[in-house]
Amino acid sequence: MAIQKAKFSIGDIVKHKHFEFRGVIYDVDFKFSNSEEWYQSIPKNVRPRKDQPFYHLLAENDDVTYEAYVSEQNLLVDDSEEPIKHPLINEIFSGKKGSSYFKPSN
């Protein structure tokens, strides 16, 4: 199985294709790297392929903030330029420009 190139980058703001949430990417797995139990808990009719990048998000919806693990096939660019209101944003990123956050320079 070939390693896939990621479509999105760390710091990109994205939204879910099917569910009402958005978030900022803080890590990328170039193939599925979560537990089999987690994978099997997804309804079969919407279960994503494992052979694609999966993204770790600081996510939010209208009610709550949380962390999400989402397949590339289920993400779209969020070009609203609205900030993500997750409490961990400032621990990981140092600023925002347009529809992307950036990490501190070393």
Question: Across the structure, where does each feature detected by a protein language model lie?
Answer:
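Intrinsically disordered, low-complexity segments enriched in polar/charged residues with Gly/Pro
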Residues: 1-3, 43-45, 88-89
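Mixed-charge, Lys/Arg-rich low-complexity intrinsically disordered regions
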Residues: 1-13, 18-22, 29-32, 103-106
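Intrinsically disordered, low-complexity boundary segments flanking structured domains
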Residues: 12, 41-46
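Broad hydrophobic/π-residue packing in well-ordered secondary structure
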Residues: 21, 43, 54-55
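Residue-level recognition of conserved beta-strand positions in structured domain cores
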Residues: 25-27, 59
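Short, solvent-exposed secondary-structure boundary/capping segments
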Residues: 32-41
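Intrinsically disordered, low-complexity, charged/polar segments
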Residues: 47-106
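Generic alpha-helix detector with strongest preference for long hydrophobic helices that associate
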Residues: 4-6, 38, 73
